[in-house]
Amino acid sequence: MKKLVAIILVLVLCAAAGASLAEKTELVVFAAASLTESLTEIKTLYETANPETELVCNFDSSGTLKTQIQEGAVCDVFISAGQKQVNQLDITRDEEKNPERLDFVLEGSRIDLLENKVALVTPADNPRGIKSFDELTELLKGGEVLMAMGNADVPVGQYTKKILEYYGLDEEALAAAGKITYGTNVKEVTTQVVQGSVDCGVVYSTDAFSAGLDVIDTATPEMCGRVIYPAAVMKNSTVPEAAQAFLDYLRGEEAMKIFEEIGFTSMKAEETK
C-alpha cells in the first residue's frame, strides 16, 4: 500500500512539473549582434523575475535578421541597430523606405529604444599611431593602413560607408587595393581589431567597451547620422502581449541601467509616438 501511495505521489508531482513546463511562454527575440552582452544579462534578470517566460535570443547582423523575418522565421521582438531594417518591414513607412510594402511590424508597437555611437578603434598597441578619423583618412589615401568595417547589409557597415563618403573616400577603390576587410556583423569587425589582423576598425562604442578596446575617435552625427536602435513586436507573434511586456521592460530602469553601463543612451524621452 505504501509503495502504491509513493508511486501515485511521484506521478502527481511529475504531472505537476510537466504542467508547469507546458505553461512556460517562449519569447523569441531577434537582436543586433551589438546587443549580445547587454541582452544576455537582461535575459537572466527577466527570466528570474518572470519564471513563466523563457527568452530565446538570436543575435546577428540586423540585415541578416531582417531577411530571416521576411523569409518566415519565428520572431516575436526585433531590435535592430539601424532604422533601415525595421523600415523595410514596416508598412507605415513610405515606398522609398519600404519599397516591397512588407507588413511585419505590429501596429503601434514600434519604438526607438537606444542610441549608440560609431567609434574608431585600434589594436592595443595602435601600430600605426592613428589618432582620429581625420588622420585615418590621410593614411587610407596614402594606402598605409588596413581597416575593418561591416558588410553593406550590416548597419555598422552602412554607417562606416557614410563616414568614408563624408571624407570623400572611394570605398570600392580602397577595397580593391586591399585596404579594407569586411565582417558579416560588428562582432566580426571587433574580433579582427582585437586579434591585430588589421590596423583599425569601425565599430560601435559599446562593442569597443565590451571588447576592452580604447576608442580613438567617435563619429559625429554630421559624419554618419545618429545611431538609433528601433524595436518592435512582430505582427506574426503568437504571444504579442508577452512580447509587448518584454519591450516595456527594456525601457524600464533595471534594463536601461545595464544598457547604459556599456555606453548605450536611452531614447525614451524621444520615443516615437
Enumerate the language-model features and the residues they cover.
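Periplasmic-binding protein-like
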Residues: D76-S80
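Exported/periplasmic ABC-transporter solute-binding proteins
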Residues: A16, E23-A49, N58, G63, ...
